[in-house]
Regions:
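A short glycine-rich, Lys/Arg-flanked "PGG" loop and its adjoining helix->strand segment in the class I
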Residues: 135-150
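A C-terminal cap/extension of S-adenosyl-L-methionine-dependent methyltransferases
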Residues: 168, 203-242
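Class I SAM-dependent methyltransferase SAM/SAH-binding core
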Residues: 54-111
Length: 242
């Protein structure tokens, strides 16, 4: 395991660092398994032939707390590089993947420590919406991706039929949403944002098609009352089958 721990100046590390320490693992929950299956489909569809490809992933939340998708990508032959703004998340991810040769860094997506045209593949799922400088972030992602590279960039869908953005807004009003600021985008808004920094958008798609309340309820049950996932699990499977 190769791990670089490099502090970056930012307003966010204390928030995400505190969350890394206080937040439980979501691994093993039925909705997390569904999330992992969705990510595998994305990789197979848009990152064919992973072997030998240098893959950059923004944030290490999923590696520390969730789907561990980088481990699966490494098993397919990719050469993963991941970074996170929170040093504690970097350390937790490093502990999970101690038997793999990854490069993990403590860094900020708005100021990446990589040269231009470095990566073959780029995966960013649920990162850029958590701060106002999302345009700076996608410009940095475009800068470090090779000209013939492929990126998967995902954000919350403002047109979610299950009204997740409204749920997040309501929870945030009462300080019940743990992930801080979270901006949602329509598909058109995201495409215009990406094209404004140079990306060429070829496909629009989505993952984790289920109500936000069900995902939250399933995770709460998994962490607090595990036997209740016998109820949430079948509900998750219904949406996974749609």
């Amino acid at each position: 395991m190769e791990v670089h721990l490099k502090q970056e100046r930012s307003e966010k590390p204390s928030f995400w660092g505190d969350l890394a320490i206080s937040f439980p693992s979501l691994k093993g929950a039925p909705s997390t398994r569904y999330y992992f299956e969705c990510e595998q489909i994305l990789y197979r569809d848009f990152f064919p032939g992973l072997r030998g490809k240098l893959l950059l992933k923004t944030d290490l939340w999923n590696e520390a707390k969730n789907t561990e998708i980088l481990g699966w990508a490494a098993d397919q032959g990719a050469q993963p590089v991941g970074f996170d703004i929170a040093l504690d998340l970097v350390r937790q991810a490093a502990a999970v993947f101690g038997n793999h040769r990854f490069t993990f860094l403590n860094s900020d997506v708005r100021h990446l420590p990589f040269a231009m045209n470095t990566f073959d593949l780029l995966y960013s799922m649920g990162t850029i919406e958590h701060f106002p400088e999302y345009k700076l972030a996608v410009a940095e992602l475009f800068r470090v991706l090779k000209p013939n590279g492929t990126a998967i960039i995902g954000v919350p869908n403002k047109l979610d039929p299950f009204l997740r953005p409204l749920l997040v807004y309501a929870l945030s009003l009462f300080r019940l949403y743990p992930y801080g600021m979270e901006k949602s985008f329509t598909p058109g808004e995201l495409q215009r944002l990406l094209e404004s920094v140079g990306f060429r958008v070829t496909t629009r798609t989505g993952i984790l098609f289920m109500p936000g309340w069900l995902r939250m309820a399933d995770l709460w049950c998994h962490c607090r009352v595990p036997w209740l996932t016998a109820i949430t699990g079948p509900l998750v499977k219904i949406f996974a089958a749609l």
